[in-house]
Amino acid sequence: MCDAFVGTWKLVSSENFDDYMKEVGVGFATRKVAGMAKPNLIITVNGDMITIRSESTFKNTEIAFKLGQEFDEVTADDRKVKSTITLDGGALVQVQKWDGKTTTINRKIVDDKLVVECIMKGVTATRIYERA
């Protein structure tokens, strides 16, 4: 199910992330620090629980969830959101909702790379990770 995602991933490229963070409402100083961070993602599966841990010089975050079940999340920029993650066509699709706003984060494996698309209104950031 999600086995292809399991492992440690390092960020190798990031496109349009500052514009995405701006659209989300992240402040200037936080955007500058977060934009320079090169996070590692550690993804594990234990039964029906999936854990995604992000480790960087900016901040460490971790979410643990079951597919299709809403959970509370505090994001790296300290937004308190309701998240739901589903598996759709081999992609992990995360929808975050807060204060009447919605953003979508799609994670998929393409050519053994983890491609993460962050979408807010008309702005899309693409971040590519390789296995560490």
Swiss-Prot record:
<dbReference type="GO" id="GO:0051427">
    <property type="term" value="F:hormone receptor binding"/>
</dbReference>
<dbReference type="GO" id="GO:0071285">
    <property type="term" value="P:cellular response to lithium ion"/>
</dbReference>
<dbReference type="GO" id="GO:0120162">
    <property type="term" value="P:positive regulation of cold-induced thermogenesis"/>
</dbReference>
<dbReference type="GO" id="GO:0070346">
    <property type="term" value="P:positive regulation of fat cell proliferation"/>
</dbReference>
<dbReference type="InterPro" id="IPR000566">
    <property type="entry name" value="Lipocln_cytosolic_FA-bd_dom"/>
</dbReference>
<feature type="binding site">
    <location>
        <begin position="127"/>
        <end position="129"/>
    </location>
    <ligand>
        <name>a fatty acid</name>
    </ligand>
</feature>
<dbReference type="GO" id="GO:0009617">
    <property type="term" value="P:response to bacterium"/>
</dbReference>
<dbReference type="InterPro" id="IPR000463">
    <property type="entry name" value="Fatty_acid-bd"/>
</dbReference>
<keyword id="KW-0539">Nucleus</keyword>
<dbReference type="GO" id="GO:0005829">
    <property type="term" value="C:cytosol"/>
</dbReference>
<dbReference type="GO" id="GO:0015908">
    <property type="term" value="P:fatty acid transport"/>
</dbReference>
<dbReference type="GO" id="GO:0050729">
    <property type="term" value="P:positive regulation of inflammatory response"/>
</dbReference>
<dbReference type="GO" id="GO:0036041">
    <property type="term" value="F:long-chain fatty acid binding"/>
</dbReference>
<dbReference type="Pfam" id="PF00061">
    <property type="entry name" value="Lipocalin"/>
</dbReference>
<keyword id="KW-0007">Acetylation</keyword>
<dbReference type="GO" id="GO:0045892">
    <property type="term" value="P:negative regulation of DNA-templated transcription"/>
</dbReference>
<dbReference type="GO" id="GO:0050873">
    <property type="term" value="P:brown fat cell differentiation"/>
</dbReference>
<dbReference type="GO" id="GO:0005737">
    <property type="term" value="C:cytoplasm"/>
</dbReference>
<dbReference type="GO" id="GO:0015909">
    <property type="term" value="P:long-chain fatty acid transport"/>
</dbReference>
<feature type="modified residue" description="Phosphoserine">
    <location>
        <position position="13"/>
    </location>
</feature>
<protein>
    <recommendedName>
        <fullName>Fatty acid-binding protein, adipocyte</fullName>
    </recommendedName>
</protein>
<comment type="function">
    <text>Lipid transport protein in adipocytes. Binds both long chain fatty acids and retinoic acid. Delivers long-chain fatty acids and retinoic acid to their cognate receptors in the nucleus. Involved in the regulation of intramuscular fat accretion.</text>
</comment>
<comment type="subunit">
    <text>Monomer. Homodimer. Interacts with PPARG.</text>
</comment>
<dbReference type="GO" id="GO:0005634">
    <property type="term" value="C:nucleus"/>
</dbReference>
<dbReference type="InterPro" id="IPR012674">
    <property type="entry name" value="Calycin"/>
</dbReference>
<feature type="modified residue" description="N-acetylcysteine">
    <location>
        <position position="2"/>
    </location>
</feature>
<dbReference type="InterPro" id="IPR031259">
    <property type="entry name" value="ILBP"/>
</dbReference>
<keyword id="KW-0597">Phosphoprotein</keyword>
<comment type="similarity">
    <text>Belongs to the calycin superfamily. Fatty-acid binding protein (FABP) family.</text>
</comment>
<feature type="modified residue" description="Phosphotyrosine; by Tyr-kinases">
    <location>
        <position position="20"/>
    </location>
</feature>
<keyword id="KW-0813">Transport</keyword>
<feature type="short sequence motif" description="Nuclear localization signal">
    <location>
        <begin position="22"/>
        <end position="32"/>
    </location>
</feature>
<keyword id="KW-0446">Lipid-binding</keyword>
<dbReference type="GO" id="GO:0005504">
    <property type="term" value="F:fatty acid binding"/>
</dbReference>
<dbReference type="GO" id="GO:0042632">
    <property type="term" value="P:cholesterol homeostasis"/>
</dbReference>
<dbReference type="GO" id="GO:0071356">
    <property type="term" value="P:cellular response to tumor necrosis factor"/>
</dbReference>
<dbReference type="GO" id="GO:0050872">
    <property type="term" value="P:white fat cell differentiation"/>
</dbReference>
<dbReference type="GO" id="GO:0005324">
    <property type="term" value="F:long-chain fatty acid transmembrane transporter activity"/>
</dbReference>
<keyword id="KW-0963">Cytoplasm</keyword>
